[in-house]
Structure formats: structure tokens, C-alpha cells
Amino acid sequence: MRYVILLRGVNVGGVTVKMAELRDLLESLGYDEVRTVLASGNALVTSESTADAVKADVEVALRARFGYPAWVQVLATDALRTIVDAYPFERGRDGWHDYVLFVLDAGVKERILALELDEAHERCADGDGVVYWTVPKGDTLDSELGKASGKAASKPHL
């Protein structure tokens, strides 16, 4: 199975994971066809293991190797394609960012979806384990959803 591994919170806030080191780590765990994506903390691997097993293995290895409380999201590439294809807003609008937020906690997701947003400024929608969001470039951190996602209660769950 081909998987996408999304690392949360790397290469920000003092947690630095070089992609060459990540690739080496994933290869040392026995994964095949390992590819990393820029300095994003995202990787692709092939494994016969389940997504849950890959998640557990990678989190333990990251914690041991890099010394930070690692959380990862692991999805089959087909599942990620389905999520991306379901994006409900116009894509690629000039001057706008399109986001897919993977939400690990149902309560956090409910709070985000309950926000009263000015739809002329930003919009969000429910997805399967995700929140779809669109916001003008330059306004991400100052938008209502941006502020809510930056709160301490939300950070570990996005």
C-alpha cells in the first residue's frame, strides 16, 4: 500500500527535521519507495502494514530520533486523493489560500465548524476527518478560523 505521512509541527517552533534524515529514518523502519516532499514534513512510503501500524511505528521512531512529541497522520494515497477531490470551494482563486485541515479531535472539529465566519472573508466546510477552509492570502493567521486554530486547546489536534 502506498501511504502519505503528514508530520505535524515540524520545521516550526524549534522542531527541525531535515528531510534527508526523515528519509533515512523511514528507510531504516523498512519502508520502501520512500520520498520526502520539500521541507514540509510530508513523506510517501510503501508498506504492507496498516496505516495504524505505520503511524505507531513512525511516531515512536520520530520521538526517539528527534526528541519531540511527534504526531503524524497516515493515509493511503487514494484516501488523500478522495479528500482533495472533495474540496467544496473554488480552487486556485487568485489571492486566496485553499486549505485542508486534518482534525484529530472531534470536539475541536465541532468548535471550528461552529465558528461564525464572514463568508466574504473566509469559509469552512466539513469533510471526512478534515475541515476545508479558504481564506485570502495574508489573512490566514488573523482570520477567525486562523485565530481559533492557533489556540492552545486546538493546536495538538490539527
Q: Model-found features: residue ranges?
A:
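Surface-exposed, charge/polar-rich loops and edge strands
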Residues: M1-S40, L44-L158
